[in-house]
């Protein structure tokens, strides 16, 4: 029996985001009904905050390649996590013969966002989301440190964005990992043009990931 149209729509949305430059994995294992609404709300907050931060960067860095048409799109989670695989509904995974496109046939067969017996699969999905956000958090903090060296003070870290990332990380941190507080070690750079360009690239990538996460949480919340 093929999966429902609703599940196929979720899969199509996630795969589309994947090919636009999106999705990887993160943690979660507590009962779905207890946390799905909170995570859904936090994912919506993250998406709106990323949108605001990106728009602000595009306006302030008007002479930099910062728009969607100009930026060199890059996925920092590539080959490290895969949230699409981790969060695939079980009914799709168990009915791979029903998947019409070769583009979807690679998706792992274990993940699930459906209600009921989903604790293990939900843990895998939320783990993937956590790892995604951790990478973006560290990159944002590293860039923020470099922006402090800008004598013009053109643009600084977005505290609201960092807070939104942190809150969602805490909500999906089912493995009780210690949330990193320091940027990843990196050689200092005096090339502020490159740093600001990298900020634009990172914000575009994070927005795509936030859309993916929000759709996953919407599915969980309505299951």
Curated annotation (Swiss-Prot):
Gene Ontology MF: a single term: cytokine activity
GO cellular component terms listed in the entry, alphabetical order: extracellular space
Signal sequence coordinates: 1-23
Pfam families: IL12
InterPro entries given in the database record: 4_helix_cytokine-like_core (IPR009079), IL-12 (IPR050676), IL-12_alpha (IPR004281)
Main location: secreted
Glycosylation sites: 41, 79, 121, 176
Subcellular location: Secreted
Keyword terms of this UniProt record: Cytokine, Disulfide bond, Glycoprotein, Growth factor, Secreted, Signal
Gene Ontology biological-process entries: immune response
Domain of life of the organism encoding this protein: Eukaryota
Coiled-coil region: none
Family that this chain belongs to: Belongs to the IL-6 superfamily.
Role according to the record: Heterodimerizes with IL12B to form the IL-12 cytokine or with EBI3/IL27B to form the IL-35 cytokine. IL-12 is primarily produced by professional antigen-presenting cells (APCs) such as B-cells and dendritic cells (DCs) as well as macrophages and granulocytes and regulates T-cell and natural killer-cell responses, induces the production of interferon-gamma (IFN-gamma), favors the differentiation of T-helper 1 (Th1) cells and is an important link between innate resistance and adaptive immunity.
Assembly with partners or alone: Heterodimer with IL12B; disulfide-linked. This heterodimer is known as interleukin IL-12. Heterodimer with EBI3/IL27B; not disulfide-linked. This heterodimer is known as interleukin IL-35. Interacts with NBR1; this interaction promotes IL-12 secretion.
Official protein name in the record: Interleukin-12 subunit alpha
Organism: Marmota monax
């Amino acid at each position: 029996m093929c999966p429902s149209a609703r599940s196929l729509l979720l899969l199509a949305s996630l795969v589309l985001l994947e090919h636009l430059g999106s999705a990887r994995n993160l943690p979660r294992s507590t009962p779905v009904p207890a946390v799905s609404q909170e995570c859904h709300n936090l994912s919506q907050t993250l998406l709106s905050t990323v949108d605001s931060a990106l728009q602000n960067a595009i306006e302030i860095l008007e002479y930099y390649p910062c728009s969607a048409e100009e930026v060199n799109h890059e996925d920092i989670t590539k080959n490290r996590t895969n949230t699409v695989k981790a969060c695939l509904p079980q009914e799709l995974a168990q009915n791979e013969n029903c998947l019409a496109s070769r583009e979807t046939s690679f998706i792992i067969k274990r993940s699930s966002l459906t209600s009921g017996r989903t604790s293990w699969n939900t843990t895998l999905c939320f783990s993937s989301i956590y790892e995604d956000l951790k990478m973006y958090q560290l990159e944002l903090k590293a860039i923020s440190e470099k922006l402090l060296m800008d004598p013009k003070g053109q643009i600084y870290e977005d505290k609201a964005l960092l807070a939104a990332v942190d809150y969602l990380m805490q909500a999906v941190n089912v493995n009780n990992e210690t949330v990193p507080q320091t940027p990843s070690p990196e050689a200092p750079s005096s090339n502020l043009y490159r740093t600001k360009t990298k900020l634009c690239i990172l914000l575009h990538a994070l927005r795509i990931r936030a859309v993916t996460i929000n759709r996953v949480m919407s599915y969980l919340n309505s299951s």
